[in-house]
Amino acid sequence: MKSACKPHGPPAGARGAPPCAGAAERAVSCAGPGRLESAARRRLAANARERRRMQGLNTAFDRLRRVVPQWGQDKKLSKYETLQMALSYIIALTRILAEAERDWVGLRCEQRGRDHPYLPFPGARLQVDPEPYGQRLFGFQPEPFPMAS
């Protein structure tokens, strides 16, 4: 922040004044007690906001750790490991949903047989999309993540 204060007294290094005295005197006379208190209050408020933000983030990670399977680990997962496990868990659940969807469609086709409106001719089978359900739904290609040990 630039100050609009003008220096008081002789410039630093002038006759009779020590070289560093001017800067210290100018800082006190320019800032004044009101400005210093205001800056300190703003800094305290910013620190409190950052503390609340970090507490909220840590609470969110704790909640995520409770729902993500840890597969036998006794130690608390790091934030990075928690995100990796959450991603793996979401991908696994997406695959389960895709398999369930395929099974359900297959059963419905077998039950309806010839009467199925989506089959072009009797005895035809539904084309199963090789792309996993999650990729169709969310449009992303999952990448394998190395697990930290």
From Swiss-Prot:
| Compartment(s) of residence | Nucleus; Perikaryon; Cell projection, Axon
Gene Ontology MF annotations: protein dimerization activity; transcription cis-regulatory region binding
Membrane-spanning intervals of the chain: none
What InterPro entries does this protein's entry cite? ATOH7_bHLH, bHLH_dom, bHLH_transcription_factors, HLH_DNA-bd_sf
Domain bHLH span(s) in chain numbering? 41-93
GO annotation terms (biological process): cell differentiation; circadian rhythm; entrainment of circadian clock; entrainment of circadian clock by photoperiod; neural retina development; optic nerve development; positive regulation of retinal ganglion cell axon guidance; positive regulation of transcription by RNA polymerase II
Give a yes or no for keyword Transcription regulation in this entry: yes
Q: Which UniProt keywords apply?
A: Cell projection, Developmental protein, Differentiation, DNA-binding, Neurogenesis, Nucleus, Transcription, Transcription regulation
**Record-linked Gene3D superfamilies:** Helix-loop-helix DNA-binding domain
Upon gene disruption, the observed phenotype is:
Mice are viable and fertile but display multiple optic abnormalities resulting in blindness. Normal hindbrain morphology, however mice show disruption of brainstem auditory signaling and binaural processing. Loss of retinal circadian rhythm photoentrainment, and decreased expression of Opn5. Loss of the retinohypothalamic tract connecting the retina to the suprachiasmatic nuclei. Loss of axon bundles, optic nerves and chiasmata, with a decreased thickness of the retinal inner plexiform layer and inner nuclear layer.
Gene Ontology cellular component terms for the protein in this record:
axon; cytosol; nucleoplasm; nucleus; perikaryon
SUPFAM superfamilies attached to this UniProt entry = HLH, helix-loop-helix DNA-binding domain (SSF47459)
UniProt tissue specificity:
Expressed in retinal ganglion cells. Expressed in the cerebellum, trapezoid body, ventral nucleus of the lateral lamniscus and in areas of the auditory hindbrain such as the cochlear nucleus, lateral superior olive and medial nucleus of the trapezoid body. Expressed in the modiolar nerve root and in the cochlear in a small group of bushy neurons within the acoustic nerve. Expressed weakly in the sensory epithelia of the saccule and utricle.
Role summary? Transcription factor that binds to DNA at the consensus sequence 5'-CAG[GC]TG-3'. Dimerization with TCF3 isoform E47 may be required in certain situations. Binds to gene promoters and enhancer elements, and thereby regulates a transcriptional program of retinal ganglion cell (RGC) determinant genes. Although the exact mechanism is not certain, retinal transcription regulation by ATOH7 has a role in RGC determination and survival, photoreceptor population development, targeting of RGC axons to the optic nerve and development of the retino-hypothalamic tract.
UniProt xrefs under PANTHER family? BASIC HELIX-LOOP-HELIX PROTEIN NEUROGENIN-RELATED, TRANSCRIPTION FACTOR ATOH7
What is the protein name for this chain?
Answer: Transcription factor Atoh7
The species this protein was found in? Mus musculus (Mouse)
Name of the gene this protein is made from: Atoh7
